[in-house]
Design a protein with these regions (language model features):
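Structural signal for conserved beta-strand scaffold positions within catalytic alpha/beta enzyme cores
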Residues: 10-12, 122
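Conserved beta-strand hairpin/beta-sheet module of binuclear metal-dependent hydrolase folds
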Residues: 6-7, 15-84
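Active-site HxH/HxHxD metal-binding segment of metal-dependent hydrolases
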Residues: 48, 55-140
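Basic/polar N-terminal segments that are highly enriched at the extreme N-terminus
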Residues: 1-4
C-alpha cells in the first residue's frame, strides 16, 4: 500500500493577508500572509489527485467577492493559478482525476472550475457546514 503514491508536490497558488487575531484566539494580532497551497498527489492507480485548488485569478475582479477581498486581501499573478503551474510541469489539467477540497473557502476551491473532468470530494462535515453557512464559515 505504501507504494501507491509515487510522489506529492506542493504549489503556492497565491496568498492572502490578514490579521492573526481575526483567525486565531490567544495570539498577538499581527498581519500575516497565508499561502493558498495546493498539493498534487501522483497515485499509481488513480492518476493525479489534487488536494485543494488555490485561488482563481478572477476573484480579483468579481464583485461578489468584494467582502472576502476586503477581509483577506489576496495577491497572485495569473501565472500563479494552478492550471498554469501544472502546465509548467507538463501536466494537463484535464488529466486530473480527483480533487479533494479541505473546505469551501475561495483560497481552497477557487480553481475548481479549471478541472471539469475531475471527481470532487468533501467531508460530510464540510458539506453540512455549507448547507447553512454563517459569514465566518465563508471567510475564515
Amino acid at each position: 500500500m505504501s507504494n501507491m503514491i509515487k510522489h506529492i508536490d506542493y504549489f503556492p497558488a497565491g496568498y492572502c493577508s490578514s490579521h492573526s487575531g481575526l483567525l486565531f484566539k490567544g495570539i498577538p494580532n499581527e498581519k500575516m500572509q497565508f499561502p493558498a497551497g495546493v498539493f498534487l498527489i501522483h497515485h499509481r492507480e488513480k492518476g493525479y489527485i489534487l488536494y485543494d485548488t488555490g485561488y482563481h485569478y478572477e476573484i480579483k475582479k468579481k464583485a461578489r467577492y468584494f467582502w472576502y477581498r476586503l477581509a483577506t486581501p489576496m495577491q497572485m499573478k495569473k501565472e500563479d493559478q494552478i492550471d498554469y503551474l501544472l502546465q509548467e510541469r507538463g501536466i494537463d489539467p484535464a488529466s486530473i482525476s480527483y480533487v479533494i477540497l479541505s473546505h469551501l473557502h475561495p483560497d481552497h476551491l477557487g480553481g475548481a472550475a479549471l478541472f471539469p473532468n475531475a471527481h470532487f470530494f468533501v467531508t460530510q462535515e464540510v458539506y453540512e457546514v455549507y448547507q447553512k453557512p454563517k459569514l465566518k464559515d465563508l471567510i475564515f
